[in-house]
Amino acid sequence: MWPRSHRHLCLAFLLVCVLSAISFLIHFHQDSIRHGLGLSVLCPDRRLVTPAVAIFCLPGTPMSPNTSSSCPQHPASLSGTWTIYPDGRFGNQMGQYATLLALAQLNGRRAFILPAMHAALAPVFRITLPVLAPEVDSRTPWQELRLHDWMSEEYADLGDPFLKLSGFPCSWTFFHHLREQIRSEFTLHDHLREEAQSVLRRLRLGRSGARPRTFVGVHVRRGDYLQVMPQRWKGVVANSAYLREAMDWFRARHEAPVFVVTSNGMEWCRENIDASKGDVMFAGDGQEASPWKDFALLTQCNHTIMTIGTFGFWAAYLAGGDTVYLANFTLPDSEFLKIFKPEAAFLPEWVGINADLSPLWPLAEP
């Protein structure tokens, strides 16, 4: 039997060991939380085949109901890893996102987006596709496929498990069967929706001061298209005659509409769109570097007048309602028609108004 003093020493030693272990675990846990959440977190997906793929959970997500899920779980039936190269502007990347989601589901593959696409879309929408870590992207043995802008039969049976898509797909033929899912992916964050609705609530009809019954979003694409369309594609952008005819189409069918005009050429719009009836509001800010305010306004309208471009397409697609678009905006021999099929670009129920091609007649082949 040990003397009492020895027993006390042993008990004290054991107590110190236990307290030290507890202190270590507490500090380790706190340090993990502090540093782990302050940096990007890698969430390994152990179900993937070699090479291992990780979901890249960006800092601060999810922090509120408005943010995207950081590590969503793919159904167990899906395999492989597909992504798409983010290219172009806001509307282009929306088309790439929707097409990736649809084709991956069709082929039973898991879809991931790259950080640049997340940076472009996540501040605006509640997107849910996980983000691929750059180091995993660089190690993956990708097969590459450049898509054309309409659904083809071969896209329904793509066998590559590691596929990186590219191109500028924005055709409803890829994803319209998933329309509600696509609309859900492109749900605006609350603050953007509320700000847009606040702008619309303040609008009044000029002559009577009454509240509008119907909001028609108008997107007028100008900017670089002023040179690109005639010089490269033998095409035109919308003129004032088209916009007048499109507005008259809605005036004939809807009571007391108001036209909410957005554009990357607002000065031209103010000078060329007839606002004398008191039902035209120049609401857009025209900021191409931060287009989401204009986009949010358009999607909260009941109907849409679009000209050309993917920005207008997505505004119309998400708003629903009636859509009027600029039709036949290139000469018949335009190279543009080799990469663009109107029947795959515009929904069948949308209403087309032919463009005025007279400025292009000097370019027409005899």
Curated annotation (Swiss-Prot):
Residues 1-8 are cytoplasmic. It is an enzyme of class 2 (transferase). GO terms for biological process: carbohydrate metabolic process; fucosylation; lipid metabolic process; olfactory bulb development; positive regulation of cell-matrix adhesion; positive regulation of endothelial cell migration; positive regulation of endothelial cell-matrix adhesion via fibronectin; positive regulation of sprouting angiogenesis. Residues 26-366 are lumenal. It is a single-pass type II membrane protein. Its EC number is 2.4.1.69, 2.4.1.344. Pfam families: Glyco_transf_11. The chain crosses the membrane at residues 9-25. One of its GO terms (molecular function) is alpha-(1,2)-fucosyltransferase activity. It catalyses: a beta-D-galactosyl-(1->4)-N-acetyl-beta-D-glucosaminyl derivative + GDP-beta-L-fucose = an alpha-L-Fuc-(1->2)-beta-D-Gal-(1->4)-beta-D-GlcNAc derivative + GDP + H(+); a ganglioside GA1 + GDP-beta-L-fucose = a ganglioside Fuc-GA1 + GDP + H(+); a beta-D-Gal-(1->3)-beta-D-GlcNAc-(1->3)-beta-D-Gal-(1->4)-beta-D-Glc-(1<->1')-Cer(d18:1(4E)) + GDP-beta-L-fucose = alpha-L-fucosyl-(1->2)- beta-D-galactosyl-(1->3)-N-acetyl-beta-D-glucosaminyl-(1->3)-beta-D-galactosyl-(1->4)-beta-D-glucosyl-(1<->1')-N-acylsphing-4-enine + GDP + H(+); a neolactoside nLc4Cer(d18:1(4E)) + GDP-beta-L-fucose = a neolactoside IV(2)-alpha-Fuc-nLc4Cer(d18:1(4E)) + GDP + H(+). Keywords: Glycoprotein, Glycosyltransferase, Golgi apparatus, Lipid metabolism, Membrane, Signal-anchor, Transferase, Transmembrane, Transmembrane helix. Catalyzes the transfer of L-fucose, from a guanosine diphosphate-beta-L-fucose, to the terminal galactose residue of glycoconjugates through an alpha(1,2) linkage leading to H antigen synthesis that is an intermediate substrate in the synthesis of ABO blood group antigens. H antigen is essential for maturation of the glomerular layer of the main olfactory bulb, in cell migration and early cell-cell contacts during tumor associated angiogenesis. Preferentially fucosylates soluble lactose and to a lesser extent fucosylates glycolipids gangliosides GA1 and GM1a. This is Galactoside alpha-(1,2)-fucosyltransferase 1. It comes from Saimiri boliviensis boliviensis (Bolivian squirrel monkey). The gene is FUT1.
